[in-house]
Amino acid sequence: MAPRCWRWWSWSAWPGVRPLPSRSTPTPGFCKKFSTQETTPQICVVGSGPAGFYTAQHLLKHHTRAHVDIYEKQLVPFGLVRFGVAPDHPEVKNVINTFTQTARSDRCAFRGNVVVGRDVSVPELREAYHAVVLSYGAEDHQPLEIPGEELPGVVSARAFVGWYNGLPENQKLAPDLSCDTAVILGQGNVALDVARILLTPPEHLEKTDITEVALGVLRQSRVKTVWIVGRRGPLQVAFTIKELREMIQLPGTQPILDPSDFLGLQDRIKDVPRPRKRLTELLLRTATEKPGVEEAARRALASRAWGLRFFRSPQQVLPTPDGRRVAGIRLAVTRLEGVGESTRAVPTGDVEDLPCGLLLSSVGYKSRPIDPSVPFDPKLGIIPNTEGRVVNAPGLYCSGWVKRGPTGVITTTMTDSFLTSQVLLKDLKAGLLPSGPRPGYTAIQALLSDRGVRPVSFSDWEKLDAEEVARGQGTGKPREKLVDRREMLQLLGH
């Protein structure tokens, strides 16, 4: 939900929302106990991904009169569940059913097509609502910050995922898959998702919700080998065993692992946590054990391959002789220093060049500041907070990735969002939030109308949803995603 432009607001223009010097000396508007008998708590959630919906769900469940408005910059809800989860993982998207139940509550409303920080400011939301929860996620990617990063053929994994998942702003990406080799920098689940989509036989994706445009490009792909590169070793990979197992079993492919990367690892995994131990053991078996007859036969017929390169840190993107495209990546060879969580990769002084025609950066997502009135830590990429309470901003909260950083799976975000909701409800009960009625969406609707902004509702989304499902039926897909904002608005009569 990053703003396109900044506007600085004077605190005097927003009575009752000046930051507290400390929680022990509240301003008059915050000290009166909240009367649950007289007032309906009006709560605003910014962002309709998992963090936003789980926060709303918990608030509605644990306060019988609270009303929650969920603001979203896209025309459609569900955030990374729709635009981030891989098309061949439909089971992960089942949480949409739960989110839909929340959105259909008569105490919840979806306000799509509203960019907080541009169409409406956070101080305006704080003036209209008793509490505001920022749950807008991490929509940017971590830059590599190495020479040549701007060359054509260097793509962020986040943009690539958005492209094949139908995120409107990524539809002009047009990745060139005419090369033989792709390199992915980073060894998390997103890196494995991207590798799997690049190497999966296209016919296996035909019945998923991948866009037809992406499927057409993948059908023409010449990519045969994908290298997945990490700075550290097998014990430090960020992907999970489910994603690794999918790669190992991927039809028509074979894994390439260097047994020397795993020397002495068996003894070092005895005391690591069980999930990490099982993951490392699977890597060890794949790298060092001779495959059985059936598996050997399968690998012999494989036309594509993927490999994990450990102890390599990106140093420079190498251009083609004419300087017009990526031709490879120069990697610094690393070794590990430290133990446990403090283990870090340090360069040995050696380098190696890895040729490729496509370079995908998957070194992490990053949140953006949403509004000049909201504190933001650019180094950590989060909103400074204590248990979800934004520092020096009573009545302002955060949940999800913008609260803790872009780590964990959907269930991690669920737990985190529930905790923020609990803190908010605790503050509400303790009288730490503004007393008296607040106008909620009524006030914001008037502002948006004056500014020519037309929000879309959840019933509008359900019309788009029905259209997507109908378009998918012709080709046996669960849906064909709408990717053009203008077309979506036309379908809604906006």
Swiss-Prot record:
Copy the pathway line from the protein's UniProt record.
Answer: Steroid metabolism; cholesterol metabolism
Any matching Pfam family: Pyr_redox_2
Lipid bilayer topology: Peripheral membrane protein
Q: What does the record give as cofactor? A: FAD
**Positions modified as Phosphoserine?**
S313
GO molecular function of the protein, one example?
NADPH binding
InterPro entries reported for this sequence: FAD/NAD-bd_sf, FAD/NAD-binding_dom, Ferredox_Rdtase, Ferredox_Rdtase_adrenod
Q: Which residues bind FAD?
A: A51, E72, L80, V116, W401, G408, V409, I410
Is the keyword Membrane in the record? yes
The UniProt record lists the keyword Plastid: no
UniProt keyword list: Cholesterol metabolism, Electron transport, FAD, Flavoprotein, Lipid metabolism, Membrane, Mitochondrion, Mitochondrion inner membrane, NADP, Oxidoreductase, Phosphoprotein, Steroid metabolism, Sterol metabolism, Transit peptide, Transport
Q: Where is the transit peptide?
A: 1-34
Q: Which reaction does it catalyse?
A: 2 reduced [adrenodoxin] + NADP(+) + H(+) = 2 oxidized [adrenodoxin] + NADPH; 2 reduced [2Fe-2S]-[ferredoxin] + NADP(+) + H(+) = 2 oxidized [2Fe-2S]-[ferredoxin] + NADPH
Family indicated by similarity: Belongs to the ferredoxin--NADP reductase type 1 family.
Task: Indicate what this protein is called per its UniProt record.
Answer: NADPH:adrenodoxin oxidoreductase, mitochondrial
Annotated organism of origin: Rattus norvegicus
Chain's gene name: Fdxr
